[in-house]
């Protein structure tokens, strides 16, 4: 992962594409694999709620909401921390420094994320196409452009995560990612 590679891994919702969020070359490679423009924000998957803490500015209400819903099929848009703005590559954070965070309710995904650290979490699909449904389809779609395919049960449900904007009272537009 530290060499800018992209991996395909299961989550509770869809198959995802992961890359090291701190490496600009990994984000460029991810955009290339998906066939999408560079710079579109991408959420980050974590192994636990505690792992999110250094990367997002969490209020007490944010923590309470996250404790109830994570791990789970949600992506929360939060205010990024100075550490995230300093260490993560352009293209991870959205407008105004928003950070999309996930903790998948999938034991294999969380074990993988424990081993690798936070990874990008974007659906495994070519830009504008539906997400892949299974590992064989992922291999056919991405081939050697993806460095590794992580096989772990159970299979993803096939429904995208629900995006919850914790900045809903802000006037900036929200980009769904």
Where do the protein language model's features map onto the residues?
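Active-site-adjacent structural elements in enzyme catalytic cores
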Residues: 1-177
